[in-house]
Amino acid sequence: MGTLNILLVDDDRNLVTTLSHGLLKAMGEATSVAVSFSGSEALSLLSTQVFDVVVSDFNMPGPSGLEFLNRIRQDHREIILVLITAYGTDALEEGVRQLGVGYITKPFEPAFLVQLIKDLIHDQDPVGRTDKVSRIVDKLGKSAGSSSSLRAGGQLLE
């Protein structure tokens, strides 16, 4: 089975450290986490590396938030996108819904992010999945449990 490649993008170095350790611990050895501290740095990484999941802060240097994720979506439809935000507005929810992006509002526990990523992997259209992501779906199995802080496409996951 291939490795699940995750890119974390946030200008808060402490949060990136906490989340990357949490993801590696929870998702297991078949996970690789790369980090970036700005939207422009992340776009550069995306031009040279392949990622299955991108988790991005809404408010950061360089292209930020929905603009950043929209640029990724234009070139990489297969990547699962997650937005981390402290701003849960109706306008943001509409933008997230249109892009098909999962999101979590701050503050949250790293376990919530892990669960959202698993849910988004399982919910991804099987036609659009790569063989590697399909194998990851089989390995992860559908986990139970969620939180009211978990959102996908602006909808609460239950």
Predicted regions located by residue number:
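Two-component/phosphorelay signaling modules centered on CheY-like receiver
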Residues: 13-34
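Conserved Asp/Asn-Gly motif in the active-site loop of CheY-like receiver
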Residues: 33-40, 110
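Acidic catalytic/metal-coordinating carboxylates
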Residues: 38-41, 64-67
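Active-site beta3 strand of CheY-like receiver
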Residues: 49-55
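Receiver (REC) domain active-site loop signature in two-component systems and cognate sites
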Residues: 60
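Alpha4 helix (beta4-alpha4-beta5 surface) of REC/receiver domains from two-component response regulators
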Residues: 67, 88-104, 115
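CheY-like receiver
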Residues: 124-158
